[in-house]
Amino acid sequence: MSWELIVIGGGPGGYTAAIRAAQLGLRTALVERDAVGGTCLNRGCIPTKALIHAAERYEEMKECETFGLRAEGVSFDYSAMCARRDQVVGQLRDGVERLLKGNKVDRITGTARILGPGRVQVGEEVLEGTNILIAAGSRPALPPVPGLDLPGVLTSDDLLTGDTFYQRLAIIGGGVIGMEFAGLYQALGAEVTVLEALDRILPTLDRELSQSLSMLMKKKGVKLCAGARVERVEQGPDGLICTYAVKDKTETVTADAVLVATGRRANTDGLCAPEVDLGLERGAIPVDDRFQTRVPGIYAIGDAVKGSIQLAHAAAAQGINAVSMLAGKEPPMDLSVVPSCVYVRPEMASVGRTEAQCKEAGISVKTAKYLTGSNSRSVITDAGRGFIKVAYDGETGVVLGAQLLCERATDLVGEFASAISRGETLEDMARVIHAHPTFAEAVGEAAEAGLGLSIHQLNR
């Protein structure tokens, strides 16, 4: 049997591409060696958020006296939390399997090896197809630090498939993965230390967002060490000893476990036969604007692509565009606007350009800020301080980017993503009526702040 498209990898990019290809009339096969859903569903986004949601409910129970409620003897059962995590993952994974079957995608289990254009080996069988789409994803990358092979040195994969809770956790890397685990473990009462090599946590995000979260984390008791270069990890009498250099001094932290969250690398090892040269660059696959590799008929999307944004929703959008073009359709997704989120408390989200990026591009940029502490729903829920900062063109008022640190930021950022994609101005955004009292009102207020017309905040 032959197919018009063979998709390698069943993560968000791969299964989305396979389903859309089938919807567009292409005979499609999906090859996945493990469970469908990839890292995101099985060992990433979904299990992390399931645990974070539980930890936040635990925090809220301890703070319930604010609302006139009393809850005595509040505790948590981490094994039970992990059991629910696994139930959530299983439910969503089963849903993906049903969608693949319902859309008549042929699901093939096994490890794929590309033998050449149109030929993929899976076990003893050789599949034939008109086109091949690689959606192989990525895996945790470990830096060359002595001692990272010791028991108790873990990756996010390890933490999200086990059910052991560590009272002392050292985290190497202050990016999104590192900070989400820091927030999770802090909420459950652990001693958390974050070691970030650069000068601030979340270095790819807006500096004000990064600095604000840093202050909040420190206030909650998380030890943050920026500019820290980890030199080695050793087994000590009381746990793992992580030695790091900061400001010409050598310091140590002792922990029950060390999480290495220093980035990810493409899953391309052994993907192709030697005669199939995709021109890999540090393991990543170069592609053109149609996601075509240097080999005709072989395409690639998602984390395995050189320079790609390593986000599940970005991979899914790339997959939709790639197969749409293969089917002779116009690509429907705007890949220039990709929101990113950090699930901490309060939540963080970013989309479009930051003020600094606008200035680097020579844009006459202005910013407006709305403090969410004056939002009615935020006061009702005791959400605390937060803000929304909007970057816009100082001449036209066109919205260029938004940075959010507030309750429900990960939901609110979608409205800004839509506005940026459509080329909307502050006036366009301010024209929309939001229900009251809602967190979403803050979006309109942020736009009004840029116009100098905010109602619930003094205009400056």
Task: Enumerate the language-model features and the residues they cover.
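Core beta-strand elements of the Rossmann-like FAD/NAD(P) dinucleotide-binding domain
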Residues: 1-3, 123-131, 248-257, 294
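Rossmann-like NAD(P)H-binding beta-loop-alpha module
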Residues: 163-205
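Hydrophobic "anchor" residues
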Residues: 47, 120, 266, 293, ...
